Design a protein with these regions (language model features):
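Conserved beta-strand-loop surface patch within small alpha/beta domains used
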Residues: 1-104, 113-166
Length: 166
């Protein structure tokens, strides 16, 4: 089962990254899954969200991440907020168990017509899950078909360059 990145994470494998200076790589099928999910939510006027699994690697530049899969379950959502249904957590954990990758390394959610950024609530959510460890948030706005990736630390959010792996 993938686990959330933590200080107790196993030794990180050394592997040279595909593009210098980029710390986030996302499998194309994950992009398709997230954007399809966001489009469905948009058609129902509801935000969506899910978790991202993959692996952390390191090279001479430092640590970088490959997102290989995503997981979600039933959601309680409206046009400005979303959360996992309490009764759907077992389904979420089962979904994570089937994911590629060895860690939960991020999360995704949508904003409906307000652009791609992390709100104060999003930042608190992200910091509550990942703290200052490696962790990424991807925000999708299906109204204009955009998405952006972010990381957070005590100083706030930072937009992160992302490469899609085909």
């Amino acid at each position: 089962m993938p686990k959330i990145i933590s200080a107790e994470s196993p030794e990180i494998e050394y592997r040279k990254r595909p593009v210098k200076g980029v710390s986030l790589y996302v499998a194309e099928e994950v992009i398709v899954t997230m954007t399809d999910h966001a489009e469905k939510g948009y058609n129902e006027n509801k935000e969506i969200m899910g978790l991202l699994t993959g692996q952390t690697l390191k090279d001479d530049e430092g640590i970088y991440v490959r997102i290989l899969d995503s997981a979600t379950s039933d959601l309680e959502a409206d046009e400005v907020s979303v959360r996992f249904c309490e009764g759907g957590l077992e389904e979420l954990f089962d979904s994570i168990d089937k994911c590629k990758g060895d860690m939960v390394i991020g999360w995704y959610h949508s904003h409906l017509g307000i652009g791609c950024y992390l709100s104060d609530v999003d930042i608190r959510t992200h910091m509550g899950i990942f703290g200052d460890e490696i962790g990424f948030a991807i925000v999708i706005d299906p109204s204009d078909e955009t998405l952006a990736a972010f990381s957070c630390d005590k100083d706030g959010q930072k937009k992160v360059p992302m490469i899609v792996l085909t």
